Every structure is written in structure tokens, then in C-alpha cells.
Amino acid sequence: MDFFSEYGDANRYKIQEVIGKGSYGVVCSAIDQHTGDKVAIKKIHNIFEHLSDAARILREIKLLRLLRHPDIVEIKHIMLPPSRRDFKDIYVVFELMDTDLHQVIKANDDLTKEHHQFFLYQMLRALKYIHTANVYHRDLKPKNILANANCKLKICDFGLARVAFNDTPTTVFWTDYVATRWYRAPELCGSFFTKYSPAIDIWSIGCIFAEILTGKPLFPGKNVVHQLDLMTDLLGTPSMDTVTRIRNEKARRYLSSMRKKQPVPFSERFPKADPAALKLLQRLLAFDPKDRPTAEEALADPYFKGLAKAEREPSCQPITKMEFEFERRKVTKEDVKELIFREILEYHPQLLKDYMNGTEKTNFLYPSALDNFRRQFANLEENGGKNGDAVPSDRKHVSLPRTTTVHSAPIPPKDHQNITSQVPQRIPGRTGRGACPVIPFENLSAMGPYNQRRVVRNPVLPPATTNLSAYAYHRKSDSSERELQQELEKDRMRYQPSEHFMDAKVVSHMSHDLRASSYYVSKAKSDVADRAALQSNMMQGIGPFNGIAAVGGNYNKVSTVQYGVSRMY
């Protein structure tokens, strides 16, 4: 039956090789055999061993669902666990990126001014979207910005991010703040509590941009004192008014007693950089956070003249408080497990529909395909990260579900209202495509009713995926098999996805017109000739940005960037 084959995604992906390992688990590259796309599958194991780790994972997958933007890494799918109550690992499918910005900087000592400009533009455009949602990343650094050889950047790793609400306390404790010191704003030096402010991310972007310009970190401090010394060596000693806003007493006392230092002209520190770039950099690295521009203000800087365009730099509506109610309450591991399961259902529309309607029976058949998928991961690790011989299946028909049924129970009732029973406004998960946009908002329709990247949140249920799978959802029904088939067919037709976007593939010897608006609407049944003409028009480069996407354009100063080892997601 189609219903039973809709959710078994383990057979959908063919594992290629290990591209990253860490304390959290393993990342493998894979092929989506339904679409042919290359993806990265992150296995996160024992996620409920520590409550803080589970909350971080929940925070990240929730934010990546809510923040759909071309310059933010996309979760394409999360595999359905074998049961609602007993799962310990999750498999998260990301779009595959070649490397990260740290490796790009390390492997390239000849990045051009066009590279510099385009890199900063993408980072600020993503930051504008993030900040207008009232989200602060708090851990921006080159390793947390994924990159492709065609110069496409995407921000990732939202595990330390926070959402600010109007009624949150003015001072927020950052006991988990462990971000790299080199990219930490001066007001955070030595502090584990501060006021939420988008200026902390702006400072980090300034440090990253300076590193792009020079090829090495700007403030590689060995400790807090050394970090402050490096900052003041370049920027000069801050005013007493600025010093009083430093929350750490030792840092404040040290800056107050510091000998007077004059700022170093940025033209001396960065002699080869574009003067317009240095003017903007100086604003990004203002010692006083109130003097730093917002991401939107930075995008309007003259440095981006001819490149920036307001219609392809969207804002995001603020995230609703209900989405992050778990951050404001004391929750148990079982609470977080239920919330993570709820997030996973965003990528399984039919199950989510039953869950939201209260008709979900919480009975899942354990598909043997997931066992086979786990063996593929284990086989890769045993073979040093390379795919050896195919792992044989235990049974001939591995796509068929096992006969055993795992029953799960709901979270026991508590004195307080269960936070998982509240239905927040949501952005549905996207089963997605694999092509990384090179021009702003490639493949994006501003009008599609089921477009999860719309600026305005869409409370309508997402279209059910048309991809086949072998996950089985066991549901009891008094109706006959024929009536059930008709009901399922009716549901599938109701949520049939429409084409609201158009592929714009990158081809050799062409680059994109970055000054053209990339918002466009394509009908579900567009004429083939019209589609081809539109694609051709959007892939024609116009100087001086011809070749800025680094896909072999005619602009001979821009080339495909080199990169080192692929990073972990």
C-alpha cells in the first residue's frame, strides 16, 4: 500500500562515505535515490543522555525549520524513528555543501575583491533574516559558515542560538556560552551574562570579514586580557562611557587602567583591501555595540552599490513565543523527547496531520530498512570512512515492515499544563530540493501557497511528499480496506504539491546577473520555451559582477575557490 511505503526513508538514501565525526555522532555523504541529489546525513546518537544536549538539538532543528533562507543551511528531511517513546538516535538529512569558510580561507590566498564583497553580502543577508526573527546566533565563526566551490555560503550550527522576546529579562545568563573567543564581541569578554543584542553577531561578522581579507584571524587572543589587548591595539582604547557598559568587573577595570592607545588606520592594517570595504568593516568593528550597524543598515552601505537589492533581502516575521516555551520552563528528558518527535513529524505530513487532529494512535511498525541503514553507517566506520561492499540485508524484502509493533505511551500528566499539548504557529518542514542557489533566492517563489521560504509564515499544512518510503504507520480503523484506500487517495490529492519554483542550474562559462531580481513566479504548467528563456536570462553575467558566482565566467579575476577537508554539519 502507498500509505505504508510513504514513510520508510532508510532505503531512499545510498550512503557514500564518512565526511565528519564528532562527540555527537557521524556525518556521511549520501545520494537521494528518489531525486539524485547529494545530501549529508547526520546521525546524532544518544541524544537524551544529557538534557542540555537534547535541548540544544531541539533548538537547532526547530530554528532550521523556522528560518528558511537561501543563506542558511537547510534540513531537507528527518527520518522517522522506530517508535515515539524508545528512540535514542536521529538521522537528519541536510543539503550537501563542499566545505566551510575556514577551509576556503586557508586554501586560498588569492581571493579577489569580488569574492570579498560577495561573501560579506551573503553573510549579512542571512543575518538580517535571522535578526528580524529576533534570533541571535551567538556562535558565528568561519567553521560555522558552510561553503561551496561556486562561492555559495550558508550559515549553520544554531545550537547556541537564542530567541529574544519582548517580555524576557533584560539580562540573560549565558552559562552555556562557549563560542570561540576570537570572534566574541568585547562586551562579552570575560562575561557569562549580558543583554541580548544583535550587535554581538555583527561584531563576529566583522571579525570573519577581516579574516577573509587577510587570510588569518584578526584577534587570536590567548585569554581575555590578550584578547582585549589585540582589540585595543587596532581600535584604540574605548571611551569611559563605553567601558562602563562592559559587564565583567576585571575587564572593565583593566580597560580603565590601560594606557591610552590610538586607533590604527584600517588602510595600514589592510593595505590591499577596497577602501569602501574598510569603511564598512570599521563600522562592524565598533567597540561600542550601539555604534555598530544592524545587518539591514550594513546591506545599505555604499560598498554593496550595484549588488544589494532590497527585494532579495527579505525580513522574517518574529518567531512566536510558543515555539520556544520549553526554554522558559523546567522540562524533563521525556518532555524534550516528545518535542523532538513533534519536530520530526514536520517532515512526515500525513503523520503530522493525524497528530495535530488528535487521531494519531502512536503505534509504529519498526521498518527493517532502518536496521539496514544503521549497518551502512557501521560498515563505513569499520572501513575507514569509505564505502566497501554493499551490506547484505537480513531478509529478501527489506522494505517490508517487521510484524512486531512497538506501543508508546504519552507523557504522564503533570501539575502544570503540558507544553507539548499547545499548538504553536509553525513553519512546516520541507522535503526539499538539493541544488544550492548561487544567485539570491534562486528557485524561490514569492507567491507559492506552500512555499516554506515565504516571508510570511504559513499555518497551512504542507503538501504530502510524493516520494515513496517503507516506514509503516499502523492505524486502526473500522472502515473497510477499500474505504481506507479512497480516504488515503483523497488526502494525497488534497495535499499534492504544486510547482511554485523553477530550477536554475549552473552551467559552465556562465554566471549570474546579481543585480537582477531573483523573485519570480513560475506556473505549474509553464511553457518549456518560456522556462528556458527565463533560465538563460538569469544566468547571464553583467559587469562588473560577471563571474562573481565563480562558476567559470568570463571575468578572469574570479575563479572557483579551492577548499580543504569537508566539515561536519
From Swiss-Prot:
<dbReference type="InterPro" id="IPR017441">
    <property type="entry name" value="Protein_kinase_ATP_BS"/>
</dbReference>
<dbReference type="GO" id="GO:0005737">
    <property type="term" value="C:cytoplasm"/>
</dbReference>
<feature type="binding site">
    <location>
        <begin position="19"/>
        <end position="27"/>
    </location>
    <ligand>
        <name>ATP</name>
    </ligand>
</feature>
<feature type="short sequence motif" description="TXY">
    <location>
        <begin position="175"/>
        <end position="177"/>
    </location>
</feature>
<keyword id="KW-0808">Transferase</keyword>
<dbReference type="InterPro" id="IPR011009">
    <property type="entry name" value="Kinase-like_dom_sf"/>
</dbReference>
<keyword id="KW-0418">Kinase</keyword>
<feature type="modified residue" description="Phosphotyrosine">
    <location>
        <position position="177"/>
    </location>
</feature>
<dbReference type="GO" id="GO:0004707">
    <property type="term" value="F:MAP kinase activity"/>
</dbReference>
<keyword id="KW-0723">Serine/threonine-protein kinase</keyword>
<dbReference type="GO" id="GO:0004674">
    <property type="term" value="F:protein serine/threonine kinase activity"/>
</dbReference>
<dbReference type="Pfam" id="PF00069">
    <property type="entry name" value="Pkinase"/>
</dbReference>
<feature type="modified residue" description="Phosphothreonine">
    <location>
        <position position="175"/>
    </location>
</feature>
<keyword id="KW-0597">Phosphoprotein</keyword>
<dbReference type="GO" id="GO:0035556">
    <property type="term" value="P:intracellular signal transduction"/>
</dbReference>
<dbReference type="InterPro" id="IPR003527">
    <property type="entry name" value="MAP_kinase_CS"/>
</dbReference>
<dbReference type="InterPro" id="IPR000719">
    <property type="entry name" value="Prot_kinase_dom"/>
</dbReference>
<dbReference type="GO" id="GO:0005524">
    <property type="term" value="F:ATP binding"/>
</dbReference>
<keyword id="KW-0067">ATP-binding</keyword>
<feature type="binding site">
    <location>
        <position position="42"/>
    </location>
    <ligand>
        <name>ATP</name>
    </ligand>
</feature>
<dbReference type="GO" id="GO:0106310">
    <property type="term" value="F:protein serine kinase activity"/>
</dbReference>
<comment type="similarity">
    <text>Belongs to the protein kinase superfamily. CMGC Ser/Thr protein kinase family. MAP kinase subfamily.</text>
</comment>
<dbReference type="InterPro" id="IPR050117">
    <property type="entry name" value="MAP_kinase"/>
</dbReference>
<keyword id="KW-0547">Nucleotide-binding</keyword>
<feature type="domain" description="Protein kinase">
    <location>
        <begin position="13"/>
        <end position="304"/>
    </location>
</feature>
<feature type="active site" description="Proton acceptor">
    <location>
        <position position="139"/>
    </location>
</feature>
<dbReference type="GO" id="GO:0005634">
    <property type="term" value="C:nucleus"/>
</dbReference>
<feature type="region of interest" description="Disordered">
    <location>
        <begin position="404"/>
        <end position="432"/>
    </location>
</feature>
<protein>
    <recommendedName>
        <fullName>Mitogen-activated protein kinase 8</fullName>
        <ecNumber>2.7.11.24</ecNumber>
    </recommendedName>
</protein>
